[in-house]
UniProtKB/Swiss-Prot annotation:
It comes from Photorhabdus laumondii subsp. laumondii (strain DSM 15139 / CIP 105565 / TT01). Its EC number is 2.5.1.55. GO terms for cellular component: cytoplasm. The gene is kdsA. This is 2-dehydro-3-deoxyphosphooctonate aldolase. It is found in: Cytoplasm. Pfam families: DAHP_synth_1. Keywords: Cytoplasm, Lipopolysaccharide biosynthesis, Transferase. Belongs to the KdsA family. GO terms for molecular function: 3-deoxy-8-phosphooctulonate synthase activity. It comes from the Bacteria. Gene3D superfamilies: Aldolase class I. Pathway: Carbohydrate biosynthesis; 3-deoxy-D-manno-octulosonate biosynthesis; 3-deoxy-D-manno-octulosonate from D-ribulose 5-phosphate: step 2/3; Bacterial outer membrane biogenesis; lipopolysaccharide biosynthesis. It is an enzyme of class 2 (transferase).
């Protein structure tokens, strides 16, 4: 199967190329924290030679509780993103939740993300496709990997084939997720070779059935990420925080920022080894 290459400026994203890191924080908490976290990511990824795209949300529109922090909003969020780009020269990925957000967000960032809970909303897909921006589609927890082909087809019908696919786990009973590593290649096959990336931190979520916030299994982030990288994928999606216990969203799943360099060193070593192997067809 020929692998599709998606270009984010000068960054090439493909299943058979060196992995790209889509990393940052869950939600913009403040301008200063975003600057600090982005600077750390840039320093580490440049040292390790890993292509890098900064990730953060300007609005967490799908929080479980009406009282949970959502973010600074569209206007302030775009100002922060613009400053990050000007200061560090980074590419940026963020998510949109409404059709009206797609164009103004695409004018600032480099990749717009379709949230898992909204991935089948045709009006939103069409609005995102019209921007011409690179798209990252989060696989809904409730659909099979093969169904991602239908979502990508919607983008292609809208004139945009610059689509990346992202696995963030699948429902495993109530309030729990499991990652099907076999599904990564199924998604690629269902879409004609589109790049597949793995959101390791959101895959670690687990919930209190009656709680208003997600719990997580941060202690297992390295082992789950190592397993995903061993498949051979286009990229890793990661959230980190300098103080996960006090993060405003999804702290229990976030990598402690101080561990970023040793963590990424392991991921790069695995990716380098896996992609040095010749392609092996075991289907016949």
């Amino acid at each position: 199967m020929q692998q599709k290459v998606v270009h984010i400026g000068d960054i090439k994203v493909a299943n058979d190329l060196p992995f790209v890191l889509f990393g940052g924080m869950n939600v913009l908490e403040s301008r200063d924290l975003a600057m600090s976290i982005c600077e750390h990511y840039v320093t580490v990824t440049q040292k390790l030679g890993i292509p890098y795209v900064f990730k953060a949300s300007f609005d967490k529109a799908n929080r479980s509780s009406i009282h949970s922090y959502r973010g600074p909003g569209l206007e302030e969020g775009m100002k922060i993103f613009q400053e990050l780009k000007q200061t560090f020269g980074v590419k940026i990925i963020t998510d949109v939740h409404e059709s009206a957000q797609a164009q103004p967000v695409a004018e600032v960032v480099d990749v717009i993300q379709l949230p898992a809970f909204l991935a089948r909303q045709t009006d939103l897909v069409e609005a995102m496709a019209r921007t011409g921006a690179v798209i990252n589609v989060k696989k809904p927890q409730f659909i099979s990997p093969g169904q991602m082909g239908n979502i990508v087809d919607k983008f292609k019908e809208g004139g945009n084939d610059q689509v990346i696919l992202c696995d963030r786990g699948s429902n495993f009973g109530y309030d729990n997720l499991v990652v099907d590593m076999l599904g990564f290649n199924v998604m690629a096959q269902a879409t004609g070779g589109h790049p597949v990336i793995f959101d390791v931190t959101h895959s670690l979520q687990c919930r209190d059935p009656f709680g208003a916030a997600s719990g997580g299994r941060r202690a297992q982030v390295a082992e789950l990420a190592r397993a995903g990288m061993a498949v051979g994928i286009a990229g890793l999606f990661l959230e980190a925080h300098p103080d996960p216990a006090n993060a405003m969203c999804d702290g229990p799943s976030a990598l402690p920022l101080a561990k970023l360099e040793p963590f990424l060193s392991q991921m790069k070593a695995i990716d380098d080894v896996v992609k040095s192997f010749p392609q092996l067809d075991t289907s016949k």
